[in-house]
Amino acid sequence: MTTPLVEMDGDEMTRILWKMIKDELLLPFIDLNTEYYDLGLNYRNETDDQVTIDAAEATKKYGVAVKCATITPNHARMDEYDLKKMYKSPNGTIRAILDGTVFRAPIVVKGIEPCVRNWKKPITLARHAYGDIYKNTEMYIDRPGKVELVYTSEDGEEKRSLVQEFKAPGVAMGMHNMSASIESFARSCFNYALDTKQDVWFGAKDTISKTYDAKFKEVFQTIFDTEFKDKFEEAGLTYFYSLIDDIVARVMKAEGGFIWACKNYDGDVMSDMVSSAFGSLAMMTSVLVSPQGYYEYEAAHGTVQRHYYRHLEGKETSTNSVATIFAWTGALRKRGELDGSQELSDFADKLEKATLSTIESGKMTKDLALITSIENPTVLNSRDFILAIREALEKML
C-alpha cells in the first residue's frame, strides 16, 4: 500500500471484531498501511469529539476511510461512560464535513434468500442526508388561530402563505432543503452509478408537492441532462424518475441491480425495508460518497451492545462480522483502484469470496443459521467464524 487508509476504530462488540479482522484476515496477508483514529466513545469524550473532526479531515486528505460502528450517546450512555456532554452522532459529523451521500447495499449470498422472490441482485439505496423533517421546526397548536409560512428577505421584504386556520388544537411543522444539497446528492448518485455500473431510479411526490418535491425532480433532471446523459449512454446506463409510490411498486417487481435514490425520510424507511427483506442488517454494506470523490466505508449496523455485554461476562458470542469485513474490502479495493494497485484490489475480491464461500459451505454465525435455506448449518462463535474465513482465504492465495 502506497497511500494510507484512514482507519476509524469504534465501540463495543464491533471494536472486538475489528481487531480480530485485522489480526486474522488482513495483517498476515497484506502490508496494511493506515492512519489510525480512535472513535471509541471514551476517546471522543477525552478529546471533546475533536478526534471525529480530525478523522473526517484526514479522509479529505487521503480520499478513502474505513470506519467501525460507534455509539451515538443517549442519557443512559452519558451515565455509563461518565461523559462530559451528549456528543453528536460521529456519522452525522463526518457526513456534514464530507458533504456525502450514504449508499447501502445488501451482501447477497447463496443460502440466504430474499423475502421478495424475484430479487436476484442487490438494490443499492441512496439516502439524501440533509434537511426535510430531520431539520424541522414543530409546534403544538393548543387554541384557535392561524399558522403561516413567512419568508423575510435580507432587505426586509416579506412573503406570507397561510398553512392552516386552526379552529381546534393540532400540530404544525416547517421544514426546508437547500438547492446546493440536492445538487450534491444528485451528483453523488450519478457518479456512484457510473462507478458501480448501475442504473439510477428516483422517486418523489411532485404531483402533490408542486414546489418542494418538484424541486428535487427538476434538479435531478437538469444535472442528469447537462452533466451525465452522455456518460450514461456511453456506459449503457439509464436514469428513471417516477412518483415515489410507483417506484415502490416497481422495486417489488424488479430483480434488483440498480441504485434507488431516496429523499431523506423515504431513505430512512426504505433502507430498513430493503435490508430486512434481503435477510439482515448484518449483511448490509454502507459507503459515504462525497461529490469531491472521498469515500468512507462501514457496516450498516450498530455496535452490537447485547453481545458486547455477554463478551464482558466471559460468555461466548456468535456475532456476524460480514458487513465489517466488507467495509474493509470496500475501502481496500477503492484504495487499490486509486493507487493503481491491482494486487490490493484482487486481495479485497478474494477476501469477499472467502467470506461468502464460508457461509455457502454451511459455516455461519447464529443469526444467519436462523434464516438460511442450507440444511444443518454449522453455527460458529465470533472468532471461529473469522478463522473459518481465514482458512478459505489461505486456500485462494
Predicted stretch roles:
Residues 1-20, 149-242:
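Glycine-rich phosphate/diphosphate-binding loop of Rossmann-like nucleotide-binding domains
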Residues 13, 17-18, 23-48, 56-59:
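N-terminal alpha-helical transmembrane segments of multi-pass membrane transport
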Residues 30-36, 196-204, 228-241, 336-348, ...:
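Flexible, glycine/charged-enriched surface loops at secondary-structure junctions
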Residues 41-55, 217-258:
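N-terminal small/polar loop signature for handling phosphorylated ligands or for N-terminal nucleophile
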Residues 42-158, 265-269:
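N-terminal glycine-rich phosphate/adenylate-binding segment common to multiple enzyme folds
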Residues 129-131, 135-186, 193, 338-341, ...:
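Glycine-rich phosphate/pyrophosphate-binding loop and the adjoining helix
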Residues 251-350, 354-361:
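Glycine-rich phosphate/nucleotide-binding loop
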